[in-house]
Amino acid sequence: LTWDCVDFSPKSIADGTASIMIEKELQRVDKTAMKSLEQKDVLFIFPQSSKRNTSMLVLKKPKTESSVRKIFIPATVAHQLESWKREQERTKEALGGEYTDYNLVLANGLGHPMERTRIAALLNALIEKNDLPKVVFHSLRHSSITYKLQLTGGDIKSVQGDSGHAQAQMV
């Protein structure tokens, strides 16, 4: 997720249309598989930290058209994102040239992409610190789908669009 895909303008928060546009994904791709990826789908290749790496991180278009979607977010989430953006700006200013700005919402302290394993580790630490039941990160998506089905009275089509599932049976 990049900041240009997040709308948390004061107007969008006030009128309830704050949103995140899902149109990019971070993926670790094997160097040999990179050749078979359609180059038009690759938006950015992140510099490698080591020449010995057998894979590379890329920002690319999602694999299916149904994966591209707009997700509306509540004002509380929009305000959290605003706060996080300000924190990133302060870090960037303090580090100067040491910070590489890739415009990423989830970036480490130097601006580099945060991969799934790091996000999962942070979630696990948060769970442990707060004595919460253990969950896997992906289960949050399923919980969200269940909650949205309840909110919409079982409207599978609208939940399908929100979740990015290509077929209603997948919801």
Put a short name on every predicted segment.
Residues 88-101:
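Short helix/loop segment immediately N-terminal to the Walker
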Residues 118-129, 139-167:
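C-terminal catalytic core of tyrosine-transesterase DNA break-rejoin enzymes
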Residues 5-16, 134, 153-171:
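Short, polar N-cap/turn motifs at the start of nucleic acid-interacting alpha helices
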Residues 59-68, 107-115, 131-139, 150:
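Short, contiguous acidic/charged loop-to-helix segments that flank catalytic cores in large enzymes
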